[in-house]
From Swiss-Prot:
Name listed for the protein in its UniProt record: Relaxosome protein TraM
Similarity comment text for this entry: Belongs to the relaxosome TraM family.
Organism: Escherichia coli
GO molecular function: DNA binding
GO cellular component, one term: cytoplasm
Domain of life: Bacteria
Length: 127
């Protein structure tokens, strides 16, 4: 085991000492608990926390990139569906059926979307 001489503030020393005293009151024997052992345990714990934080910084979730990618996918989907609806409305199999006229399909979609959005984001009376 490596030996390290370390200078700490009186406040830190008092806190480490308080942990040692608490463990002794909980029944730990003097030979099982010491300031040195407790300080070593706290240093190891702090090192693990530090390493975990560094890993999170390296592989951090980028909300802006996620939002950009999500918006791009939504716009592509919206554009694709609009083209498909336009093509479908010109099909001879549905011609003459008002349910499949482009303007009616768009209005129907808007109503359904508005209804679903209202479920999750109720309109305030103030708006």
């Amino acid at each position: 085991m490596a030996r390290v001489i370390l200078y700490i503030s009186n406040d830190v020393y008092d806190k480490v000492n308080a942990i040692v005293e608490q463990r002794r009151q909980e029944g730990a024997r003097d030979k099982d608990i010491s300031v040195s052992g407790t300080a070593s345990m706290l240093l190891e714990l702090g090192l693990r926390v530090y390493e975990a934080q560094m890993e999170r910084k390296e592989s951090a979730f980028n909300q802006t990139e996620f939002n950009k990618l999500l918006l791009e996918c939504v716009v592509k989907t919206q554009s694709s569906v609009a083209k498909i609806l336009g093509i479908e409305s010109l099909s001879p199999h549905v011609s003459g059926n008002p349910k499949f006229e482009y303007a009616n399909m768009v209005e129907d979609i808007r109503e359904k979307v508005s209804s679903e959005m209202e479920r999750f984001f109720p309109k305030n009376d103030e708006e």
